[in-house]
């Protein structure tokens, strides 16, 4: 397990990249990152009584922020550990999961569907998602999950008519 707060580590990047420690949980840190994103989204939706366009805009803004902050954070952490795509970096799952949730009704059935679809696309990585992994450093780490989130959103919207 990585030493998150050890000497020579960039703390802000580790906090963001691991989504405040969710990526340090085992097994399946990516799933923990996605579940944390869904729980935060679900809690915020109900706390702020958000739905419809307001929830979609807020979720999209959160996904954009996670992407824009996540790329440099993932780059820093990957460099510090000397690995291309460390498994404990889960800000990419958070960004992708929030994209998958952009147009989802804030109920458990639709949230679970978005979670399952996103994790399936994130693990499977169909074309062109796999090609995005080849982008350099944090860009490749994050953008493949952003694309997986977009595919999960599209399929989720199609399927949600029957859920």
Language-model-detected regions and their locations in the chain:
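Short Lys/Arg-rich amphipathic alpha-helical segments
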Residues: 25-44, 58-66
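Alpha-helical transmembrane segments of multi-pass membrane proteins
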Residues: 41-42, 63-72, 101-102, 114-123, ...
